[in-house]
Each structure stands twice: as structure tokens, then as C-alpha cells.
């Protein structure tokens, strides 16, 4: 089962994206575990997930988070701002699964 970590400033807006992603996964018959956290939780959580997606509002943190993600062999990326703004859970889910299987 893929495990996806979403990270934003406080974990609030990404928690809504998580709900949309879980709904999309259910429709597609995919079992996933998705969690939203704030930036202060990234270091403690990344090791337990297959990939991490950052909210577009914290894309500036990508350079800070990449070294640990690479050390742990965890892909990390920034969510497309249009998909994030539209809460396109299906697209974000599919992008995260591609990231895991790349």
C-alpha cells in the first residue's frame, strides 16, 4: 500500500487535499495511506512514507527538505499550484503514485 506524505505550512490546507485524494483512491479501488503535516513535522515523518508532496505555498522549503529525502531514498516534489488550488485529488494522487514508481 503506497504511503504518501503531504506537507504544508501547518497541515491545514493539505488535509482538505488528503480527503479529495482518499476519495479518488476509493473510486479507483486503490488502497493508500495519506497524511498531511506541517513543516515542523517533516523530519519526523518522512522516513515512514514512500514519497512527500509539498504544498505550493512552501515550495521554498524544497531545497531544505531534499537532502534528508534523498538520504532516505524518498522522492519529493511540489504539488502543481493549479491542481492544489482546484483541490484536484485525483490528479495529485496520480502524480504521487507516478513519483513513487518512477
Outline where the language-model segments fall.
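Conserved active-site segments centered on acidic
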Residues: 2-39
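Short acidic/histidine-rich motifs immediately flanking catalytic phosphotransfer sites
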Residues: 46-51
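Ser/Thr/Gly-rich flexible loops in soluble cytosolic domains mediating phosphotransfer, phosphorylation
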Residues: 3, 75-102
